Structure formats: C-alpha cells, structure tokens
C-alpha cells in the first residue's frame, strides 16, 4: 500500500465549514459565533475549501488537527 500525503485541516477551519455549509449560517452570523470578523471568516473558508479540494483531487488523506504548527506530511 502506498504512503499517503496528508492535508491538515485545523479545528477553526473545520468549525467554519460546519457553521457555514452544514449548519447553513451566513458568513456574518457564523463569524460572530466564532468571534472573528467576516473577512477573516471568508479567508478561513477559502483556505479550507482549497485544502479539501487538494485532498480529493490529489488522493491525499485529510487529517483534523489542533496544532496550527503542524505541516502537511507523508504517512
């Protein structure tokens, strides 16, 4: 079996996607729940969408992490 490269999704990115796409909240409402500005929320969504797309398109494992210093690795 080949080793998979990982895409790391941080907890705040997971929370953003949950609030917006799963719970159906508008960006302004979701940003308030997270205690961040709407522009920051929009950047977070953009970042996590790109990570998820990278994982799906390139066959990478998607890992959820609490560590913002963790980088993409090969497993």
Give the ranges of each region predicted by the language model.
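Alpha-helical residues within the helix-turn-helix
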Residues: 32
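Short helix-to-turn junction characteristic of helix-turn-helix DNA-binding domains
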Residues: 20-23
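Helix-turn-helix DNA-binding motif, specifically the short coil turn and the N-cap/start of the second
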Residues: 2, 26, 35-40
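Short, Lys/Arg-enriched anionic-surface-contact patches
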Residues: 1-11
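Short alpha-helical "packing" element that flanks the helix-turn-helix/winged-helix DNA-binding module
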Residues: 16-17
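Residues within the DNA-recognition helix of helix-turn-helix
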Residues: 44-47
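C-terminal flanking helix
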Residues: 49-56
């Amino acid at each position: 079996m080949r080793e998979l490269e990982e895409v790391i999704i941080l907890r705040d990115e997971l929370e953003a996607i949950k609030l917006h796409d799963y719970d159906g909240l508008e960006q302004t409402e979701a940003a308030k729940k997270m205690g961040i500005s709407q522009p920051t929320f929009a950047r977070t969504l953009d970042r996590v969408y790109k990570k998820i797309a990278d994982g799906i398109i390139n066959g990478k494992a998607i890992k959820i992490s609490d560590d913002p210093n963790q980088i993409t690795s090969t497993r």
